[in-house]
Each structure stands twice: as C-alpha cells, then as structure tokens.
Curated annotation (Swiss-Prot):
Component of a multiprotein complex with RPA2 and SPATA22. Interacts with SPATA22. Interacts with the complex BRME1:HSF2BP:BRCA2. The gene is Meiob. Residues 167-272 bind DNA. Single-stranded DNA-binding protein required for homologous recombination in meiosis I. Required for double strand breaks (DSBs) repair and crossover formation and promotion of faithful and complete synapsis. Not required for the initial loading of recombinases but required to maintain a proper number of RAD51 and DMC1 foci after the zygotene stage. May act by ensuring the stabilization of recombinases, which is required for successful homology search and meiotic recombination. Displays Single-stranded DNA 3'-5' exonuclease activity in vitro. GO terms for biological process: double-strand break repair via homologous recombination; female meiosis I; fertilization; homologous chromosome pairing at meiosis; male meiosis I; male meiotic nuclear division; resolution of meiotic recombination intermediates. Keywords: Chromosome, Cytoplasm, DNA-binding, Exonuclease, Hydrolase, Meiosis, Nuclease, Nucleus. It is found in: Cytoplasm; Nucleus; Chromosome. The lineage of its organism: Eukaryota, Metazoa, Chordata, Craniata, Vertebrata. GO terms for molecular function: chromatin binding; single-stranded DNA 3'-5' DNA exonuclease activity; single-stranded DNA binding. The keyword Magnesium does not apply. This is Meiosis-specific with OB domain-containing protein. CDD domains: RPA1_DBD_B (cd04475). It comes from the Eukaryota. One of its GO terms (cellular component) is nucleus.
Length: 470
C-alpha cells in the first residue's frame, strides 16, 4: 500500500512567518517560469541563474517560490518537476513580500510572504500522485481568481482598444494548439512562440500566444475542443499585424486547466453539445481569418506587394493589403486538380488523402476524428504590373467568391464548372489579402485571399488613381 503524506505533518502556507526554521512544506505546483541568467554583480564576468514557481496547499493559500544559484543547480532543479506535480520543500527561507514591486512580474498571491530556496540548505522533492492526499491534487483545477471574474472573448473583441495593455482573466475552450516555432533574435538570443486558438459561446476564434517554454509545454498537453482553461492575468493587446485583439501569457499568468467551476462546466457542456453538430462551422472559422476587413485600407499593385515582401525579409509577421486585379488562373473544371479537400475537425488542417489521417493530430491516433469537406483552391491574380501565383482561396471565402456551396459545386457537371470559371476569369475584383514570407511557398510568398468581390469601377479608378495608376 502506498504511503500517504498527511498534510498535518507539514507547515501550512497560512501559518508562515519570518522566524520559522527547519520548515517542511507540501504543495502542488500551479505555475512556473523559465530559467534565466543575469550578470553576477559580485563576480564580474559570471552569471547567476534563477527561476520561480508557485505552490498551493489549500483553496485560499498559495505562495511564490524563488531560487538563485549556479546554472547547473538551477537547471537541474527546474527540470525536476513541472506544473501539476506535488512537491515537498525543506528548509526554505521565508521573506516578507514587497507586494507592489514583485507582483508587477510575479503571480499575485494572498500571502504576505515568499519562499527563497538556498542551493546549500534547501531541498525540493517531487511526490508521486499516489502518495498525495486527493484534496491537494484537486487544487490544480481551482482557479486562483474568483470563478466569475473573467472577460468573455466577445467582450474583449467588443472593447477593443480600451483593453489594450490591460491584464485580465479569460475563461475559454481550446480550439487548436499550434506547433512551437523557434527563432533567433538580432542579438543572437534564442526564443520560441506558440499560438493557441481559443473560443467560447460568444466568439469562434481568439489568439493567445505563449512565449516561454513552460507555458508552451503546458499548452502541448491540451486537447482541441475538449480542454477548458481559466487564464488569470494574461495581457491583452491589439495585434496590429493581424488587426485584432489577442492575449499573451506573461510571467504573472497562472493557467488552470479544466477548472472545477460552474462557469467552466457550462462552457464544457457547450463544447460537447456543439462538437458533432457544427463541424462545418468549426472548420470554416479555422479558414476564416479573424481580421476586420475595414481595418485593411492600403491599396497595392502586384509589383508593390512583391517589393514590400522584399522589405519584410526576415520578418515572421504577416502584412495585409487591397489589390485590384483579375483572377487569371482558376482550375475548378480540371479533373486532375483537386479543389475540394477533407479537413480535420480537431485542428482544421488538410487530411492526408493516402492515409486518411490528419498529420497534425496523428500523434493521438487512438482518438476518432471527424472530417469536413472544404474548398481549397489555388488561383493566380494579375494586374497591369504582374501576377501573384498560387494564392489560397478556401473555406467560406471561396464559397462567396464562386457563388456556390460545396454541395452545389459537387453536383455540377464539367460544363457547368467551366461556365462558372469563365464568369469569374478576367473580371476586375477588389481583393483583400494576407501575405506572409514563407520559403515553402511558391515565389517565397504565401498569399491568402480574405475577400474577393467584383470591383466597383468608380471606386477602383479612384483608389488606383491615388497611386498614379488607372
């Protein structure tokens, strides 16, 4: 039989005071930062390393724990445990917390104290979940903020710039978790980022970005349209590149996964009830960019877009623009060209035709996946200055452009498809575009069509005349 660690044998976080010695504390890790190095003022030319984490031993009590020391010690200690695990801390130093200064960058805690670990005197031991009281383990599903203290995603979008820079709480479901992307900054520091798409009853897609390894590691364990999170103290900003509001995980953030609250249970029920009935809508909103077209105002020619792409070389963020152009290639009546594809209901990516599996979700092959048909058309766009080749026209944008649904298209004869093609070819259109540099894309530029409608001749002449073109 497993040996249980009884809470009564440890000092409770609620009982902490500075004069205590030979402490032994048990708690569950609810937050953790990355290891960082800083110049050592006492030893010029060397560095000291640090990381911090937050532990909890009851619903109302949690504290921040910091450790400083050599790189080997700090990295070894940090690698020893992760968020969600239970730890025993022996002989920490209790310090009074400087609330205003410290909580600018650390999670806000109800305690007046913080714990400091010494390389020579303190010890941290990881407990097996079988050795821990279930009351302690259940704390991982309890948000650190009041369960109703959050913004809905629609409220964030509606408030827009008034929330720019604010730190708030968010309750949402996970729509998709992107692959971590790694980069090197101009001063040769290595970095990483991971985009998580969220949704709730009010908003189909909202971006949250993780920049640190610990939050990225946590996010990789989340299941699309099954996981609900309560993210306390995320920063909200207006993303000028994507023209929308977005959230960022910061050092103050604590994320509670599948919170045990009435509000989270309502959201979870919403997910389950809509999971099978709205697959088509779910897929479509993956393909739709969450960009307000009214915020895209810059008009370009093809030549100018290619020039701007060269100016942006080395940048990962997309740019947006309006193009007055003709669809010069539209192979929707060619039997050898596939324009309708299956997309995964979990992540929105194209399903491999040969294996009939999603390459993104294949790591969890034990789960059954639903697929949905979607337009996936590559078109060429041409104006008087040149041609953008292999531009992506997909989802509902494709349906609106073609003037038919997937099902209507699939019932068309080859002659009807050819007639539809010639109705669209060589008609000047007003096209909203998202462009991003990509070495995988043809010409090094990935172009996504956000909207494509027949241009008003007067509007087109006016806009192009403003650039010296007609």
């Amino acid at each position: 039989m497993a040996k249980f660690f009884a809470l009564k044998n440890f000092t409770a976080l609620s009982d902490l005071h500075p004069n205590m010695a030979n402490l032994k504390i048990i708690g569950i890790v609810i937050g953790k930062t990355d290891v960082k190095g800083f110049p050592d003022r006492k030893n010029i030319g060397s560095e000291r390393y640090t990381f911090s984490f937050t532990i909890r031993d009851s619903p109302n009590h949690f504290v921040n724990v910091s450790s400083w020391g050599s790189e080997d010690y700090i990295r070894s200690l940090s690698d020893n445990f992760k968020v969600g695990e239970c730890v025993i801390i022996e002989n920490p130093l209790i310090q009074r917390k400087e609330t205003e200064r410290e909580e600018r960058f650390s999670p806000a805690t109800p305690s007046n104290y913080k714990l400091l670990l010494s390389e020579n005197h303190s010890m941290v031991k990881v407990c097996s979940p079988y050795e821990v009281d279930t009351k302690l383990l259940s704390l991982i599903h309890l948000p650190v903020k009041e369960s109703r203290d959050y913004y809905s995603l629609a409220d964030i979008v509606a408030n827009g710039h008034s929330l720019d820079g604010r730190i708030i709480n968010v309750l949402a479901a996970v729509r998709s978790v992107g692959e971590p992307k790694y980069f090197t900054t101009s001063d040769r520091r290595k970095g990483q980022r991971c985009e998580v798409k969220l949704f709730d009853e009010t908003e189909p897609s909202f971006t949250m970005t993780c920049w640190d390894n610990e939050s990225i590691l946590l996010a990789q364990s989340w299941m699309a349209r099954e996981t609900v999170i309560f993210a306390s103290d995320v920063r909200i900003n207006f993303n000028k590149f994507q023209n929308c509001m977005a959230a960022t995980v910061i050092s103050k953030t604590i994320i509670t996964v599948n919170p045990d609250t009435p509000e989270a249970n309502i959201l979870l029920n919403f997910i389950r009830e809509n999971k099978e009935t709205s697959i088509a809508d779910e897929i479509d909103s993956y393909l739709k960019e969450s960009v307000n077209l009214n915020t895209i105002v810059n008009v370009y020619t093809v030549e100018q877009l290619k020039g701007k792409a060269l100016e942006n070389e080395g940048k990962v963020d997309p740019f947006y623009g309006i193009l007055y152009a003709y669809i010069s290639t539209l192979n929707i009546d060619d039997e050898t060209t596939k324009v309708v594809r299956n997309r995964c209901s979990s992540c929105g990516y194209i399903v491999n035709d040969a294996s009939n599996t999603c390459t993104i979700c294949s790591k969890d092959s034990s789960r059954s996946r639903s697929f949905c048909l979607s337009f996936d058309v590559l078109v060429d766009l041409t104006d008087h200055t040149g041609t953008l080749r292999s531009c992506s026209l997909s989802g509902s944008v494709a349906e609106e452009t073609l003037g038919c649904t997937i099902n209507e298209f699939l019932t068309m004869t080859s002659e009807q498809k050819t007639k539809l093609k010639w109705q669209l070819l060589l008609e000047r259109s007003k096209i909203y575009l998202k462009l991003i540099l990509s070495h995988r894309a043809r010409g090094g530029l990935k172009v996504t069509i956000l909207s494509c409608k027949l241009a008003d001749p007067i509007e087109a002449s006016r806009d192009l005349a403003g650039q010296g073109h007609t």
